[in-house]
A protein has these predicted regions:
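Short loop/beta submotifs within extracellular cysteine-rich repeat domains
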Residues: 1, 40-41, 68-70, 80-81, ...
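Surface-exposed, proline-enriched loop/turn segments that connect beta strands in immunoglobulin-like
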Residues: 3-7
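Solvent-exposed loop/turn motifs of extracellular immunoglobulin-like beta-sandwich domains
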Residues: 10-17, 26-28, 66-70, 77-88
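Structured beta-strand/turn binding interfaces of compact recognition modules in eukaryotic regulators
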Residues: 13, 21-23, 36, 63, ...
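N-terminal V-set
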Residues: 24-59
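Short, structured motif recognition centered on aromatic/hydrophobic residues
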Residues: 33, 72-73
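Extracellular/luminal immunoglobulin-like beta-sandwich modules
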Residues: 81, 85-111
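Type I single-pass or GPI-anchored cell-surface glycoprotein architecture
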Residues: 109-142
């Protein structure tokens, strides 16, 4: 089982998609995304049914692409609390699951600047610019 090099950075409030690849012969085995600490006691966040396709649960989705022997996990609306050690996992019979460790680091949210124009005489004189920083808009008159 392989995946991306750690750590995997993501900005707060954005989405993260991680792709893991598994060996031939494990196509119909269940795949999962597990959060926390050590592989033996991590919490399974989302799991496939063992068939090809996508499963969604809250902010998490997992898609098994069996013909390509890969599965991808997407986490939306990432917050600082999502920063942790995760594992891509493939269930195996009669032995320990195959797992790949990935450290996810959450970076501060990006700054987005946009400009709004209006037909209002008041706003045509003063373009209203919004600064979105840390998720809170602040209006500035220019």
């Amino acid at each position: 089982l392989t995946g991306p090099a750690s750590p995997v950075p993501v900005h707060s409030r954005e989405s993260l998609t991680v792709r893991c690849s598994y060996q031939t012969g494990f196509e119909t085995h269940k795949k999962y995304w597990c959060k926390g600490g050590f592989w033996k006691n991590c919490d399974i966040v989302i799991k496939t049914s063992g068939t090809e396709g996508e499963t969604t649960s809250g902010r998490f989705s997992i898609r098994d692409e069996q013909t390509q022997q890969t599965f991808s996990v997407t986490m939306t609306g990432v917050t600082q609390e999502d920063e942790d050690t995760y594992f891509c996992g493939v269930e195996r019979f009669w032995t320990a699951d195959d797992m790949y460790e990935i450290k996810v680091t959450v970076l501060p949210g990006k700054v987005h600047i946009g400009e709004i124009h209006s037909d209002s005489p008041m706003l045509t004189k003063h373009h209203l610019q919004f600064l979105l920083m840390w998720g809170y808009p602040k209006a500035l008159y220019l």
